[in-house]
Amino acid sequence: IHVALQDFPLERAEYRNHDYWLQVAKELKPTLNPADAILLSEVLGLYEALTAVYPNRPKGFIHSDLFRDNTLFEGNQLKGILDFYELNKDEFLFDIAITLNDFCTDYPEVHLNEVKAQAFLEAYETVRPLTTDEKACLEIYLAMAAARFWLMRLQVAQKNAQQGRTGDDILQKNPQEMRNMLVERLKFMTA
């Protein structure tokens, strides 16, 4: 997607980019318990510090939601990608981190499978090599991607509760899973 849409003539305003997630974090932070508020501040602070030092992180169209449930496989062959609702112009590294966090994670422990992650990155780089700055920031993007989906799930849960939506027809993914992933990813931070 990153290379194929490089010269795509249509535009879409940035949607759910980092500024959007900062706003969501600001809105949700008062509702978090003290430990979660500290965790959120930690990941945002690390992200701001590292991205200031490593600015060469290319942007373009990204899927923004490339989880297993948005792909179609026949055996080991990818046949289709679904759900382009979140298609956005953002940093490619977010798409890479989102994909690594789902496809290369051992659930339910949320440990990143290093062998799978390395295989993914090697294959990706045959199509689009990562910049030195992208490589330097990959760990914080893994954490930040987990934080974005933690925030999204908290936001959805909050809206469902406010609007009284309950029952089997409501898809509500567990925010705790992404929080656990965030904690796990922060363990690898070398900053």
Write out the residue ranges for each language-model feature:
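A cross-family kinase active-site recognition segment
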Residues: 1-37, 57-59, 89
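Short acidic/histidine-centered micro-motifs embedded in hydrophobic/aromatic stretches
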Residues: 17-20, 43, 141
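ATP/Mg2+ or Mg2+-diphosphate-binding catalytic cores
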Residues: 27, 149-191
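A structural signal for short hydrophobic/aromatic patches embedded in well-ordered alpha helices
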Residues: 40, 120, 137-138
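Hydrophobic core segments within long, regular secondary-structure runs in both alpha-
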Residues: 44, 117-121, 176-179, 183
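Active-site acidic catalytic loop and adjacent metal/ATP-binding pocket
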Residues: 48-94
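Active-site activation/catalytic loop segments of kinase-like enzymes and analogous catalytic loops
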Residues: 93-129, 144-161
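All-alpha amphipathic helical-bundle segments outside canonical DNA-binding/catalytic cores
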Residues: 130-142
